[in-house]
């Protein structure tokens, strides 16, 4: 797979850093469909860091695999801060990971609305210690591939940031 150089570099940095610190990472992906864990496992030595990756495209998968509350999805929708946070927490709970990152968004070309346009992505990273970061990105209607790659970049940045939070 040919990843953009900056994504490859971010993934390598995380694998090196987590390896040195004996940390494990898991992912939960909706709009990226496994691209985040794909970029990370492209790096040699990633098997000592990556515990698992959930691809929870449907609401049912978010509920069954990650324990996202049906009420959260009903009240806030799949693409929301609340859902991203529950996805990240559920990933930590349902894995052996020290840190988890979760993404949910609208990659387009359809599925957008005035309140939730194409290019809206919610990302959350959680630590087993209770640390949490959320980021709302509005990438705009850049096209499906560009939105998905931009989400991978932001997710990797969020993981690196949380893993080094004071």
Regions found by a protein language model. Give the residues of each.
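Short alpha-helical segments enriched in small residues
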Residues: 1-166
């Amino acid at each position: 797979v040919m990843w953009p150089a900056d994504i490859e570099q971010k993934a390598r940095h995380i694998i090196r850093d987590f390896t040195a610190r004996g940390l494990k990472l898991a992912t939960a992906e909706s709009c990226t469909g496994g691209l985040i864990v794909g970029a990370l496992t492209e790096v040699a030595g990633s098997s000592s860091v990556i515990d698992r990756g959930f691809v929870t495209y449907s609401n049912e998968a978010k509920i069954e695999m990650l324990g996202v509350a049906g009420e959260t999805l009903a009240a806030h929708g799949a693409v929301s801060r609340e859902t991203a946070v529950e996805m990240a927490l559920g990933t930590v709970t349902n894995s052996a990971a020290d840190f988890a990152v979760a993404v949910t968004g609208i990659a387009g070309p359809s599925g957008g609305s005035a309140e939730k346009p194409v290019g809206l992505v919610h990302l959350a990273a959680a630590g087993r210690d209770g640390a949490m970061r959320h980021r709302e990105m509005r990438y705009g209607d850049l096209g499906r591939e560009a939105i998905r790659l931009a989400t991978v970049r932001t997710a990797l940045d969020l993981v690196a940031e949380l893993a080094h939070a004071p």
